[in-house]
């Protein structure tokens, strides 16, 4: 879903610059005891700013028409879009303009296509492997749950993956 007019193109190019500089496109594997397969792959886009510039994140939310903005306790604010359709639409708009985080965006878009079918053990495993690839491209925290943890759990549950 490409922006069609020049004004929209400028807005999304500006926003992509923000994401490249002060944002994070991420996929993480989350333990979920209430899930049949015990794991979920969660995808998100987050942009951080000092709370003194909180208004910029509100502008981003308005431009995209989705996401949440919150003030943290450490003097920072964050804008976040989590999961599915909203994130897919957002990444598709930003993809032509992303530079540093283009590879992460492409991988997360692949994961999003798999999300509706992750109750299938093999699809969950594919999504987890893609999440590991996203993790290799990010500068964030060390991951505690990897695709190998998902594979081991699925085997214990009697699934061949």
Curated annotation (Swiss-Prot):
EC numbers on record: 3.1.-.-
Pfam families linked: LAGLIDADG_1
InterPro entries (alphabetical): Homing_endonucl, LAGLIDADG_dom
Subcellular location: Plastid, Chloroplast
A single GO molecular function term of this UniProt record: endonuclease activity
SUPFAM superfamilies linked: Homing endonucleases (SSF55608)
Biological role stated in the UniProt entry: Probable endonuclease involved in intron homing.
Recorded family membership: Belongs to the LAGLIDADG endonuclease family.
Listed name of the protein: DNA endonuclease I-CvuI
Organism annotation: Chlorella vulgaris (Green alga)
Lineage of origin: Eukaryota, Viridiplantae, Chlorophyta, core chlorophytes, Trebouxiophyceae
């Amino acid at each position: 879903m490409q922006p069609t007019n020049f004004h929209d193109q400028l807005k999304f190019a500006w926003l992509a610059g923000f994401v490249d500089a002060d944002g994070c496109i991420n996929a993480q594997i989350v333990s979920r005891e209430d899930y049949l397969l015990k794991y979920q792959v969660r995808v998100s886009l987050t942009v951080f700013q000092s709370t003194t510039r909180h208004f910029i994140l509100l502008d981003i939310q308005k431009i995209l028409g989705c996401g949440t903005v919150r003030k943290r306790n450490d003097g920072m604010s964050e804008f976040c879009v989590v999961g599915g359709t909203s994130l897919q639409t957002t990444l598709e708009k930003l993809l032509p303009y992303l530079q540093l985080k283009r590879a992460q965006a492409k991988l997360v878009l692949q994961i999003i296509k798999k999300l509706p079918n992750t109750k299938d053990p093999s699809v969950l495993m594919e999504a987890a492997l893609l999440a590991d690839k996203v993790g290799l491209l990010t500068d964030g925290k060390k991951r505690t749950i990897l695709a190998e943890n998902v594979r081991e759990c699925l085997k214990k549950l009697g699934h061949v993956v």
